[in-house]
Amino acid sequence: MADEGKSYNEHDDRVSFPQRRKKGRGPFRWKSGEGNRRSGRGGSSVRSSRLEDDDRDVAMSDVQDAPRVRYTPYAARPNRRGDNWNERTRIHVTLPLRRDRSAAERGGAGTSQDGTSKNWFKITIPYGRKYDKSWLLNVIQSKCSVPFTPIEFHYENTRAQFFVEDASTASALKAVNYKILDRENRRISIIINSSSPPHSVQNELKPEQVEQLKLIMSKRYDGSQQALDLKGLRSDPDLVAQNIDVVLNRRSCMAATLRIIEENIPELLSLNLSNNKLYRLDDLSSIVQKAPNLKILNLSGNELKSERELDKIKGLKLEELWLDGNTLCDTFRDQSTYISAVRERFPKLLRLDGHELPPPIAFDVEAPTTLPPCKGSYFGTETLKNLVLHFLQQYYAVYDSGDRQRLLDAYHDGACCSLSIPFTPQNPARSNLAEYFKDSRNVKKLKDPTLRFRLLKHTRLNVVAFLNELPKTQHDINSFVVDISAQTSTLLCFSVNGVFKEVDGKSRDSLRAFTRTFVAVPASNSGLCIVNDELFVRNASADEIQRAFAMPAPTPSSSPVPTLSPEQQEMLQAFSTQSGMNLEWSQKCLQDNNWDYTRSAQAFTHLKAKGEIPEVAFMK
């Protein structure tokens, strides 16, 4: 392909094309049917100096993550020596701007194609690289009071950055600063800086230029092979004659090209992008969605330096790839390592740089199956269910009250207790679980038997004293899933999974998930007495955070029926009998529906069908 010097515009049958018949069907689907628009637009007088200039310098000014020129037009170089945490996470909004300076001097204003002036702002999320782009933008949009369109989203070192184009949007994003918690319960910082217009806006092709590009691409398309040849596109004679500068390593030009492909030939099978001075493939990444059937891709003669660039298009199911002439080809010690690295991204590849590859080693792997959903609590019998739920309700009412000393009666004289948190290779003492670290008895991390023994809390006095030192909490009773794993006439073992919120200290309002395993024996008051208590605490997942405290638990009261009229008390008794819920939850349901019995019954039926009424509501 590349080594034969083949050019698709040598074919005579590509000058005119059939009209687009149906989206995604037919040999060619160009919308453009206009005649030659080039008359009167430059004729034969060509600015040859444009092509004689150094292409590399022009292109490099638009490559945001190229070395030495990463978005330097948009912000001053930070003072690394005097940098500190507060300065790096502080919001910077330079509003209002001085009116005695021109837009060019301020660097924050631009002009749209309709002549209106716009202010541009660069949005920076420190350490944003660790977040998925879709998740990050969606969560910011959900908290932002103004809908916004992120322009040129990209990662810069450890930061995530994008641009917005007006002051009201920037102010709304400023208000979101530190309002978002990530999956590790860390607050996300958002920094706003005034900025010059992003390159994709500065170099955006005009509508008439896009139409000309579409016509030229149609001439380079071979409908019989569903192949598009964009080799050395900037030097195309028709583009030069029209004085249209299409540099494919500019985000705006690549975006326009891919948009034309998506709208006209999404069934494309072969694409030649050789000799276009491509330094990175960020802007090509959307081709995975816009031309999902692509099988042949020619990237030879470009300036790709790292194999990691291929990760950005590895969603393509390529069978043939050309990379020769790129610096990355020289970074491998031998041919087999090169083939292996490429095939890691494209496992179905059959030809590389024109050479046949040995058949890929494949395994018969069963189709992925979805794990069954987690079931609810398991109690074994109704008697055990009532016993355990009553115990948990009493236990966590005291545990969350702020005075855990009253838990002494819940523990056996010889009880023992331990705590553990997840093992992480990073320094856990500096994580947001740091308050639990010193008492963690994670045996995967802890090898010293003496220390293991010391971290076990023995006797009920030591156990309750230890529990008093842990952060104050509020548990979401509705999140509890209880499983009874063992039961004899003299012993009961059960586990509780759920979420809680810390209500004071450095991690106030942080959500945690926990698993707690109790081993208990019968108590003299027909209740339970704990002999072993094992607590595991971790950060709550995104789903757990979203579901937490969705249905507030009723406030415990000393009287189940406080100050109700005789009619309300009669209604409450009837509703409790028919629904099966206890008086406390029945009253809550009636109150939430303004004591309308019919509405309350409908709400109860609806929530019960969805499984959103907790077990404790039925404990009498």
Swiss-Prot record:
Q: Which organism is it from?
A: Bos taurus
Annotated Basic and acidic residues bias: 1-15, 49-59
Q: Let me see what the UniProt entry remarks about domains.
A: The minimal CTE binding domain consists of an RNP-type RNA binding domain (RBD) and leucine-rich repeats. The nucleoporin binding domain consists of a NTF2 domain (also called NTF2-like domain) and a TAP-C domain (also called UBA-like domain). It has 2 nucleoporin-FG-repeats binding sites (one in the NTF2 and the other in the TAP-C domain) which contribute to nucleoporin association and act synergistically to export cellular mRNAs.
- Motif Nuclear export signal extends across 82-111
Q: Sites of the modification 3'-nitrotyrosine?
A: Y127
Which gene is the coding source of this polypeptide chain? NXF1
List the residue ranges of the region (Major non-specific RNA-binding).
60-119
Q: What binding partners and quaternary form does the record give?
A: Heterodimer (via NTF2 domain) with NXT1. The formation of NXF1-NXT1 heterodimers is required for the NXF1-mediated nuclear mRNA export. Forms a complex with RANBP2/NUP358, NXT1 and RANGAP1. Associates with the exon junction complex (EJC) and with the transcription/export (TREX) complex. Found in a mRNA complex with UPF3A and UPF3B. Found in a post-splicing complex with RBM8A, UPF1, UPF2, UPF3A, UPF3B and RNPS1.
Residue numbers spanned by region RNA-binding (RBD): 2-119
Disordered, as annotated region: 1-88
Q: Which UniProt keywords apply?
A: Acetylation, Cytoplasm, Leucine-rich repeat, Methylation, mRNA transport, Nitration, Nucleus, Repeat, RNA-binding, Transport
Instruction: Please indicate which superkingdom the organism of origin belongs to.
Output: Eukaryota
Q: What is the lineage of its organism?
A: Eukaryota, Metazoa, Chordata, Craniata, Vertebrata
- Family recorded in the similarity comment: Belongs to the NXF family.
**What Pfam families would the database entry show?**
LRR_NXF1-5, NXF_NTF2, Tap-RNA_bind, TAP_C
What name does this protein carry? Nuclear RNA export factor 1
Disulfide bond annotation, renumbered to this chain: none
Question: What residue stretches are annotated with the TAP-C domain?
Answer: 566-620
Where is the segment annotated Interaction with ALYREF/THOC4 and LUZP4?
Answer: 2-199
Task: Pinpoint the residue ranges of every LRR repeat in the record.
Answer: 267-292, 293-316, 317-344, 345-372
Q: Where is the composition biased (Basic residues)?
A: 19-28
* Omega-N-methylarginine modified-residue sites: R41
- What does this gene product do? Involved in the nuclear export of mRNA species bearing retroviral constitutive transport elements (CTE) and in the export of mRNA from the nucleus to the cytoplasm (TAP/NFX1 pathway). The NXF1-NXT1 heterodimer is involved in the export of HSP70 mRNA in conjunction with ALYREF/THOC4 and THOC5 components of the TREX complex. ALYREF/THOC4-bound mRNA is thought to be transferred to the NXF1-NXT1 heterodimer for export.
